[in-house]
């Protein structure tokens, strides 16, 4: 599945859902139905890396409802860009 198809894939528009994005480097992102992106920090040292430390081949597990598409796109970008670096984690602030 490509990132574009994951973003445009919308399921269960009437039900609140949670989106989750992770990369090979261990960075993860989750988003509740309130459109607040959580995570995007704490990439590990494992997995193939492309230029700038961004993990190549992002594994995406997405269940986006219609009300959180914009937040999901922004959170996805933040999760990918935050994927490099030392181990750790970030939550909702």
UniProtKB/Swiss-Prot annotation:
<dbReference type="GO" id="GO:0030587">
    <property type="term" value="P:sorocarp development"/>
</dbReference>
<feature type="compositionally biased region" description="Polar residues">
    <location>
        <begin position="1"/>
        <end position="14"/>
    </location>
</feature>
<feature type="compositionally biased region" description="Low complexity">
    <location>
        <begin position="16"/>
        <end position="26"/>
    </location>
</feature>
<dbReference type="InterPro" id="IPR050533">
    <property type="entry name" value="HssA/B-like_chaperone"/>
</dbReference>
<feature type="region of interest" description="Disordered">
    <location>
        <begin position="1"/>
        <end position="26"/>
    </location>
</feature>
<comment type="similarity">
    <text>Belongs to the hssA/B family.</text>
</comment>
<protein>
    <recommendedName>
        <fullName>Protein hssA</fullName>
    </recommendedName>
</protein>
<dbReference type="Pfam" id="PF05710">
    <property type="entry name" value="Coiled"/>
</dbReference>
<dbReference type="InterPro" id="IPR008455">
    <property type="entry name" value="HssA/B-related"/>
</dbReference>
């Amino acid at each position: 599945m490509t990132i574009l198809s994951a973003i445009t894939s919308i399921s269960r528009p009437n039900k609140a859902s949670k989106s989750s994005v992770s990369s090979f480097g261990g960075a993860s992102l989750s988003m509740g139905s309130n459109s607040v992106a959580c995570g995007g920090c704490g990439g590990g040292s494992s997995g193939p890396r492309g230029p700038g430390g961004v993990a190549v081949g992002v594994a995406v597990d997405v269940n986006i409802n219609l009300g959180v598409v914009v937040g999901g796109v922004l959170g996805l970008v933040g999760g990918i860009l935050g994927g490099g670096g030392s181990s750790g984690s970030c939550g909702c602030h």
